[in-house]
């Protein structure tokens, strides 16, 4: 054998060893690629108050179901996914995995064959340094789920930092949902949505070859920020408050700003004690973050550019009936489809049963736009109203037997507001008078 041939075989052998090492490394670290999924736009819907009624039919709804009974007051959707929330703290055990699957099986059985349930999503904010443990837990869930049931997880953006064990989790799931909201290490009083940098995130997510849907914020929040003597800020969230609780108060001064993601933030500085509001003290700031057409459209446009294994958008969330901080799905759909969202208020009427009289409960849908000035809304009845019982935060007035007047203050929020009950001797239709 010549010196040249010896060198050739040494090079071949070395290349073979290197190739084997690369293949071994790939097999140990990479999750197997999953089939791509069709694009769908969906919503998370959270347990609690009944969901807002709307004629909009979603492609897919991710339903938080804390018990073992399937909620039967859900909006119509082509498909549903069961969501189980795991709070941070307790160790994830095999018993926890078994309990999740047992609850999922009970829910699918209770829902019946007429409800199309695609699978289970686990909503768990796993610490990044525990992703390997989370992967072992997901393996237990995956192997216990019935055949054909898909497994999805929510995902924190921090998981995708360099040198994490995120593959340990992704290898066992059919889908992950990176959440582009509340992405910081701690929640702040103002701002929710995270600007979506497609050039940064698309290559990262697509490299795992696992389908994903992008989680986008369509909700708002009210928070109080209080600074102590050392300059440290403490944030408290007001979960049952409405923007209408703060408008028109002399004890508050108002300013506004926009977040980097395009949300509107209405700031109220407390300048004097407020009667009946012991939780607010002079020096406090109340920050109201509201989603806007700009914030939702920018996020949706970005999500459509991901390509690869991107399989859609999930909006957090479908609002309840009494919310004034969250965009209605109808309005979200208009925004993401490129249409101009409506600017006018809309009236909704329900007819409860009353003895010997016609009763009509009136709700004013404020629309998706945030107005920076007060506006007047006139409601006209096609016949005489014998009695109008005003209720709710807007304090409407019956000016004439067939007309009701409502003043909607600036920055009143989103969603539907109850106006009161109209009582008449016979059927009466109500409509908003064009301005």
Question: Where are each of the predicted segments found?
Answer:
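N-terminal Sec-pathway targeting helices
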Residues: 1-16
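Membrane-interface motif at the C-terminal end of an N-terminal transmembrane signal
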Residues: 20-36
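Chitinase-like catalytic core of GlcNAc-active glycosidases
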Residues: 35-47, 64-173
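Generic structural signal for well-ordered alpha-helices
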Residues: 69-71, 97-109, 135-142, 195-205, ...
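Substrate-binding surface in catalytic domains of secreted glycosidases
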Residues: 139-247
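Substrate-binding cleft of secreted/luminal carbohydrate-active enzymes
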Residues: 219, 227-341
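Short, well-ordered beta-strand segments enriched in hydrophobic/aromatic residues
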Residues: 358-368
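C-terminal beta-sandwich/jelly-roll accessory domains of carbohydrate-active enzymes
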Residues: 367-435
């Amino acid at each position: 054998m010549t010196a040249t041939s010896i060198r050739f075989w040494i090079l071949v052998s070395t290349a073979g060893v290197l190739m084997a090492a690369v293949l071994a490394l790939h097999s140990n670290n990479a999750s197997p690629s999953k089939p791509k999924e069709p694009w769908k736009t969906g919503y998370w819907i959270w347990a609690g108050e009944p969901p807002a009624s709307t004629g909009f039919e979603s492609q897919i709804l991710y339903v938080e179901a804390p018990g073992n009974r399937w909620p039967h007051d859900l909006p119509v959707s082509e498909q549903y996914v069961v969501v189980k929330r795991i709070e941070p703290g307790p160790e994830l055990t095999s018993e926890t995995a078994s309990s999740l699957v047992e609850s999922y099986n009970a829910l699918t059985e209770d829902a019946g064959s007429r409800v199309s349930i695609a699978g289970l999503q686990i909503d768990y904010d796993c610490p990044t340094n525990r992703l390997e443990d989370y992967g072992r837990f997901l393996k237990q869930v995956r192997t216990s789920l019935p055949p054909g049931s898909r497994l999805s997880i929510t995902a924190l953006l921090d998981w995708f930092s360099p040198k994490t064990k995120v593959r340990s989790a992704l290898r066992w799931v059919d889908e992950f949902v990176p959440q582009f909201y509340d992405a910081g290490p701690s929640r702040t009083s103002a701002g929710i949505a995270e600007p979506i940098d497609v050039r940064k995130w698309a290559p990262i997510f697509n490299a795992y070859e696992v389908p994903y849907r992008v989680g986008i914020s369509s909700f708002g929040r009210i928070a109080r920020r209080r600074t102590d003597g050392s300059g440290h800020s403490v944030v408290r969230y007001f979960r049952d408050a409405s923007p209408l609780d703060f408008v028109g108060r002399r004890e508050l001064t108002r300013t506004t700003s926009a977040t980097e993601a395009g949300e509107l933030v209405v700031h109220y500085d407390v300048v004097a004690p407020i009667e009946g509001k012991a939780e607010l003290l002079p020096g406090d700031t109340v920050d109201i973050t509201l989603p806007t057409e700009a914030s939702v459209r920018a996020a949706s446009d970005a999500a459509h550019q991901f390509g690869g294994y991107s399989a859609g958008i999930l909006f957090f969330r479908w609002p309840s009936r009494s919310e004034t901080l969250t965009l209605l799905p109808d309005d979200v759909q208009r925004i993401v489809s490129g249409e101009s969202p409506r600017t006018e208020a809309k009236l909704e009427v329900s007819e409860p049963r009353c003895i010997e009289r016609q009763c009509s409960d009136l709700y004013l849908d404020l629309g998706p736009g945030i107005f920076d000035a007060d506006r007047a809304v006139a409601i006209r009845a096609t016949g005489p109203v014998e009695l109008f019982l005003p209720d709710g935060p807007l304090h409407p007035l019956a000016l004439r037997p067939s007309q009701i007047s409502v003043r909607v203050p600036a920055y009143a929020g989103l969603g539907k507001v109850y106006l009161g009950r109209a009582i008449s001797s016979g059927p009466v239709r109500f409509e908003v008078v064009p301005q």
